[in-house]
């Protein structure tokens, strides 16, 4: 697997996304060949505002959704292809020629590329432009696991303030609950 910076910090992409916001080891133990299953599961998940196992996380998603409606953060004209150009056009030739990957069923992400052990998708709104990078990495004990990274370019000072304001909520409530949800769902996939 390429290093995140090597993959995305090429040419003008490095200028577009200059901040690694989050990196998480996912509780998704598996074999070398399980990455396609992780990508399928990740792209087919329900909206987190309705599907999170944590009531606090669902409440935060509901508040964010309401604020987005009030302030117009999530209007289509604020997204990829409108306010910001897609990063797919700025990827190096080998990634641009790769499959973009599957569409997301219930999330506003636009796939960028899919490789044997990497998947990247972008999202934009009035507060930021971000790339979600999902990788499949050795776990140190002979198996593999998922790794999630989020690279962000805030949209001006308001976007930077927004990202700073939500950081504690993401780290203390949203991501810990999401990791528990991911672990439960992954174990459920193994049971099938």
Which functions belong to the PLM regions below?
Residues 21-25, 118, 143-147:
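Intrinsic-disorder/low-complexity, polar/charged segments enriched in Ser/Thr/Lys/Arg/Asp/Glu/Gln
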Residues 1-98:
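Hydrophobic ligand-binding cavity/cleft-lining segments
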Residues 162-192:
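A conserved amphipathic terminal alpha-helix motif
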Residues 94-140:
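Hydrophobic-ligand binding "helix-grip"
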Residues 56-57, 150-154, 177-184:
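Short C-terminal domain-edge/linker segments immediately following a structured domain
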Residues 57-68, 159, 163, 167, ...:
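Short hydrophobic helices that act as membrane-entry/anchoring signals
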Residues 125-164:
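Beta-strand/loop substructures that line and gate deep hydrophobic ligand-binding cavities in soluble
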